[in-house]
Amino acid sequence: MQQIKFIDLFSGMSGIRKGFEQACRKQSVACKCVFTSEIKPAALEVLKQNYPDEVPYGDITKIETGDIPDFDILLAGFPCQAFSFAGKRLGFEDTRGTLFFDVARILKAKKPKGFILENVEGLVTHDRKDPTQKIGRTLTVILETLEALGYYVSWKVLNAKDFGIPQNRKRIYLTGSLKSKPDLSFETTPSPKLKNILESGLPTESSPFIKKLLKKFPPSELYGKSVKDKRGGKNNIHSWDIELKGAVTEEEKQLLNILLKERRKKKWASEIGIDWMDGMPLTKAQISTFYKHPDLQNILDSLTDKGYLVLEHPKQKIGGQRIKDESLPKGYNIVSGKKSFEINKILDPNDVAPTLVAMDMEHLFVVDNGGLRTLTGKEGLRLFGYPDDYSFDIPKKDKYDLLGNTVAVPVIKAVSERLLHTL
């Protein structure tokens, strides 16, 4: 087979490119990237470090197809966006105004031999009006558009942990060829444990929060624990478990643990005539129905003063948003937020990592050297199957942002091999 020329759109860290190149090498096929498009500054810096002789193009929406060299394969990890349906279905034209439109217009103009697209699992049911349908309108239009362009298209949701990566990461992969439909049935590979990719003996962090956490729990007991005040469960540590906001009595702790579960019951919303909200503020009278204590008011006051509880109005659902209804009596609620604490989860080295997303990565910690630390850049790369020699010299915050949005390289490699078989 002669040299395969490919383009890499929405390149990010070039993960799709990496996987495709690995597949080509495995099959002894020469390949060359002739065009790269990316706009994020941190990603452009990483691309410069790894491909110093190449100059990426910018915003793909502003690039004419005539300015793109001829190529054989299109690679793209495009964002999931809804299409605007103005009455009659128009197929290709329905995609206008989205970044998939740019993928489609390039395929239409250049007619390459094939493509590989990657997206979040949610694309499968995105904009689905009927719950009984397997796929939503967005994916339906994408598939119809690709098939109308002459491609035999296959798609499948694949999990990175089935391809040798210790991360539970499901994504949808779409691939198409002008000759035949690529086969996306795979035998799964047992996933390695997180400990297989972790470094050891590195410096740990020592904030007041971490000191309180380690004072209450030895490191080995923290494996797999989440730290948040939104939920209960045996794998969850709450702020009162480590007395983060001040010492708590057994009675106070007992009340908090019961309230955490009770406030989620739908009957409380029904009692005051509002739509159910997950985490209702409850009045003293309501609390007294499930927690009977002669000193209840003092316990509630104490927990409010310390910052474990807040006295607030219930929220009505108005136009899809929750708005405080000041006509309803205030109730006691647990003070919580999605990013309440600097640690969201301590990863279990004997398990696989959860799906890594950009906004959560800096809140994921591992046990090391008798303490706790965040993931290193090298560990982050390994969790997506990047080689250790990949250059990644950018600030930690930017590393987490790029990693949370990148692809699992071994999955791309496997999909690429199937596409190459059709050429």
Swiss-Prot record:
CDD domains: Cyt_C5_DNA_methylase
Pfam families: DNA_methylase
Signal peptide segment: none
GO-annotated molecular function: DNA (cytosine-5-)-methyltransferase activity; DNA binding
Active site positions, chain numbering: 80
NCBIfam families per the UniProt record, alphabetical: dcm (TIGR00675)
Family of this protein: Belongs to the class I-like SAM-binding methyltransferase superfamily. C5-methyltransferase family.
Protein name listed in UniProt: Type II methyltransferase M.NlaIV
Species classification: Bacteria, Pseudomonadati, Pseudomonadota, Betaproteobacteria, Neisseriales
